[in-house]
Amino acid sequence: MAREGLGLEITELRLGLSCGEPKKNEKKRMFSEIDGGVEENGGSGDRKSVDKKNQVVGWPPVCSYRKKNMNEGSKMYMKVSMDGAPYLRKIDLCLHKGYLELALALEKLFDCCGIEEALKDAENCEHVPIYEDKDGDWMLVGDVPWEMFIESCKRLRIMKRSDAKGFDLQPKGSLKRFI
């Protein structure tokens, strides 16, 4: 059927088993050829040693390994948006030791002032920093202790004071103890 010498043997179609002697497949390698031709003639002890050598390396996946084992020195980048700013920024919460350092960093990040005053007196400032917690609720920055804030914060937003009242966000009286 196929003409010899033209290299068309590989494209030859057959119905059923070949009548001739099976040829060694020269185009593709079998798994045993890739594996180095490991023979199964040895005892069960030999097979166990081969299995140990051929185990999958890197399991569990690297991503879950990093999440579980590299918590120390990790970075907690949070998205920060500001009303009126056409861009978002990210800030690492782990670099800051408290709300005052965070407020100063936000002021430098967006070139605005008054965020630090908003933490102390939210009634007399133009902008108010708020955050979304794990439950999806928006809260004022400074309402909870710093450690709890770091654990629950998903993203930050700097709103105008008039818009924050629409969210029904009122500062708690005990706000100054966390600052």
Curated annotation (Swiss-Prot):
Induction conditions: By auxin.
Keywords: Auxin signaling pathway, Nucleus, Repressor, Transcription, Transcription regulation
Chain residue ranges for the region called Disordered: 31-52
Compartment(s) where it occurs, according to its Swiss-Prot or TrEMBL record: Nucleus
Segments carrying motif EAR-like (transcriptional repression): 13-17
Gene Ontology terms: biological process: auxin-activated signaling pathway; regulation of DNA-templated transcription
GO CC term, one of those recorded: nucleus
Segments forming domain PB1: 75-163
InterPro entries with a match to the protein in the record: AUX/IAA_dom, AUX_IAA, PB1-like
Domain notes: The N-terminal half of the protein contains two conserved domains I and II. Domain I includes a slightly degenerated ERF-associated amphiphilic repression (EAR) motif which seems to be involved in the activity of transcriptional repression. Domain II is required for the correct degradation of the protein through the SCF-mediated ubiquitin-proteasome pathway. Interactions between Aux/IAA proteins and auxin response factors (ARFs) occur through their C-terminal dimerization domains III and IV.
Function field: Aux/IAA proteins are short-lived transcriptional factors that function as repressors of early auxin response genes at low auxin concentrations. Repression is thought to result from the interaction with auxin response factors (ARFs), proteins that bind to the auxin-responsive promoter element (AuxRE). Formation of heterodimers with ARF proteins may alter their ability to modulate early auxin response genes expression.
Protein family per UniProt: Belongs to the Aux/IAA family.
Assembly and binders: Homodimers and heterodimers.
Stated name of the protein: Auxin-induced protein IAA6
The gene coding this protein: IAA6
